[in-house]
Each structure stands twice: as structure tokens, then as C-alpha cells.
């Protein structure tokens, strides 16, 4: 059993179906049905007609790709220096005993507090003692005029 292909749509044509058109120059075209034949004669581009095989191939429709295993990238540990501290310093601090680190930390805190106190004391000495507040001035009383007598009748 010979199965042909439609010249326009690309679908299979089984025996007993389809129509063959032969042009004057000898080229023969086999169409699945009248719809394909008319579309060809109207010079439609099968790549732009959504139901044709060529369109589906061009726009990658219905292609089931092999689901290859996705590789997950493992995070790699990497040690490097940080701004203000070299790698050697960081490693030295890490390898110190906790008691020594605690003592060092307490010492640093103590020094920082001392500096803070010194700055505060210097600021206090530099700023002159605030002058005594004088009694607030009393505002002058507003002079209000008497309302003019109403002239006129009852209404």
C-alpha cells in the first residue's frame, strides 16, 4: 500500500483519496482534498496556514523533547578575604579559644565606652552653661472697642 503526501498540507494521502494536478511543465501535485487544492491555487503559503504540517514544524508544535535530567548546580564553599580583614586574620580568629575571644571582645567594648565617655565630657566642657531664663514677656492686652449702639426700630 503506497501512502502519498499532500503537496500543500503535508498530511498522508491513503489510496483512493486525494487529487493529482499536473501542470503544463510536467510537475505533478497531489492534494489531500479540495481545501488544500484551493489554498494552493490561491497561492497561500502553507507555513502561514495554522493547520498545515509545515506551520506546525516552523512554530515547533507537538514536538515532545526527551526529558533530560536537569542538573542542579551544587553550591561550593569558598573562603576569601572580606573588606577590612584578610583571610589569615579571619582564620586566626576562628581558631582562637572562646575564652580568649570573649576577653578580647570585652576589652574592645571597654575601650569603645571609654572613648564615648571622653567625647561626651569634651562636649560638655566646650558648651557654655546655659544662661538663666528671663521671665517671659507679657503680651500687651488688646484694646477692644465697645460695639456701637443699635439704631433702628424693632425690625
UniProtKB/Swiss-Prot annotation:
Feature: compositional bias, Low complexity: 124-133
Pfam families reported for this sequence: Ribosomal_L24e
Keyword Ribosomal protein in annotation: yes
GO CC, any one term: cytosolic large ribosomal subunit
One GO term of the biological process aspect: cytoplasmic translation
Region entry Disordered, spans: 119-155
Superkingdom, natural source: Eukaryota
Matching PANTHER family: 60S RIBOSOMAL PROTEIN L24 (PTHR10792), RIBOSOMAL PROTEIN L24 (PTHR10792:SF1)
Family: Belongs to the eukaryotic ribosomal protein eL24 family.
Protein name in UniProt: Large ribosomal subunit protein eL24
Organism in which the protein naturally occurs: Drosophila melanogaster (Fruit fly)
Gene coding for it: RpL24
